[in-house]
Regions:
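C-terminal halves and exits of single transmembrane alpha-helices
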Residues: 1-3, 200
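Long, contiguous internal "core" modules enriched in hydrophobic/ aromatic residues
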Residues: 3-179
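Aromatic-anchored segments of alpha-helical transmembrane domains
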Residues: 53, 123-124, 189-196
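Central hydrophobic cores of alpha-helical transmembrane segments
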Residues: 182-190
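Juxtamembrane boundary at the C-terminal end of a transmembrane helix
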Residues: 194-210
């Protein structure tokens, strides 16, 4: 879906290998087809994107022997995190590659959406804190692994959620004179998205027997 826009982006055209690939006859034909059936391809991309977003959490939830994963909040947390990292990636691209002055309103909208998504993640994690601490043996062991690990507390919750939250909040309320704070926030959100998935896999404790 984004291929026609990529062919119009000066930055990508200037890249040695990418610029040549974008001028291939096959790529041009694909761009023409995508432009012609733009609405259909767009909806197809939306369906595929939502499917990829949701399925990871649903897959983890299907393991009943792991209390950390067998939780209705897991698909919700992973879905919110996926949309948040998507917003962060778009902001990163718009501030570093595209740099179109006409996109100011869109960038501000993405910042507001990401702010809401980060807030939702923090609320969900707050509920996970009590669910795991007061849950089964498997849940309590997962709690110990997560909430005593500085990588989770400082890396994910601190730098992956709280710091970007305040950077984007300041940008939405008062604005920034430089793009650096929002770029920093976007990079931190992407890092936090990885750490969430890493620690969720790491802290899944199997309850035996099941």
């Amino acid at each position: 879906y984004a291929l026609p826009y990529a062919r119009e982006t000066p930055f990508l055209k200037r890249l040695p290998l990418v610029g040549k690939v974008l001028e291939w006859r096959m790529v041009i034909k694909i761009c023409e087809a995508v432009t012609r059936f733009r609405k259909f391809v767009g909806w197809l991309a939306v369906i595929n994107g939502v499917g990829v977003t949701v399925y990871t959490g649903l897959l983890l939830q299907s393991f009943p022997a792991v209390a950390l994963w067998a939780n209705p909040g897991v698909p919700l947390l992973f879905t919110v995190s996926a949309f948040s990292t998507a917003m962060a990636f778009l902001l990163l691209i718009m501030y570093t590659v595209i740099k179109d002055a006409e996109d100011t309103r869109i960038r501000l909208l993405y910042e507001r959406i990401d702010l809401v998504l980060i807030s939702a993640e923090l609320v969900i994690l707050f509920s996970f804190f009590f669910y795991l601490k007061r849950g089964s043996e498997s849940a309590m062991r997962s709690w110990e692994l997560l909430f005593t690990d500085f990588g989770w507390l400082i890396g994910f919750i601190g730098f992956g959620l709280i710091v970007p939250f305040f950077l984007e909040l300041r940008g939405v309320v008062k604005g920034w004179t430089s793009h650096v704070p929002i770029i920093t926030a976007s990079v931190l959100v992407l890092m936090g998205g990885y750490l969430l998935r890493h620690y969720f896999m790491y802290a899944g404790i199997y309850a035996y027997p099941w």
